[in-house]
């Protein structure tokens, strides 16, 4: 149904890290003004192969890894948590340094989850006459991707999603 107004609330995006080895659970706070987080797959799901005789094959890539870039203001206390998680991982040099990571838009249906994530790139430091951003690059293995909308779905879309095996929460119908 056209004409439905959607609502996206940036302050409803949550990023939660659970680190089993230390027992901590931390919700990241203090995001930058212009960006919160971006998530991208490491590789295409399928790669096209074309033979010399123009036969086409798609090759499935099972790699479900992703990279998330989390943008925090330099004043965010979450910078401290991520710094010391990174140090824990460097010293552990084992799976004990990895953590679960959930990125969720609570004003919509998008979510991204990995049960094995780790800090791949720590941000550059810098200071100026303005607020600086710290961009943390986090590698996520076994990533679940769910790109979802932020408005109620039409009956036709609900039927389509049901046919695809999706069970929508009643608030979206």
Curated annotation (Swiss-Prot):
It comes from Pseudomonas phage KPP10 (Bacteriophage KPP10). Keywords: Virion. GO terms for cellular component: virion component. Its main location: virion. This is Structural protein ORF10. It is found in: Virion. It holds the Pfam family KPP10_Orf10.
């Amino acid at each position: 149904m056209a004409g439905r107004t959607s609502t996206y609330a940036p302050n409803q995006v949550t990023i939660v890290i659970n680190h089993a080895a230390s027992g901590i659970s931390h919700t990241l706070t203090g995001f930058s003004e212009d960006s919160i987080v971006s998530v991208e797959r490491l590789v295409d799901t399928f790669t096209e192969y074309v033979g010399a005789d123009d036969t086409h094959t798609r090759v499935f890539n099972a790699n479900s890894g992703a990279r998330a870039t989390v943008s925090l203001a330099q004043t965010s206390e979450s910078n401290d948590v991520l710094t010391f998680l990174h140090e824990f991982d460097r010293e552990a040099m084992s799976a004990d340094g990895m953590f679960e990571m959930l990125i969720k838009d609570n004003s919509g249906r998008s979510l991204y989850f990995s049960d094995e994530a780790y800090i791949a790139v720590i941000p550059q430091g810098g200071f100026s006459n303005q607020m600086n951003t710290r961009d943390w690059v986090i590698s996520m293995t076994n990533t679940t991707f769910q790109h979802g909308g932020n408005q109620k779905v039409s009956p036709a879309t609900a039927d389509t999603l049901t046919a695809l095996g999706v069970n929508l929460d009643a608030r979206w119908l």
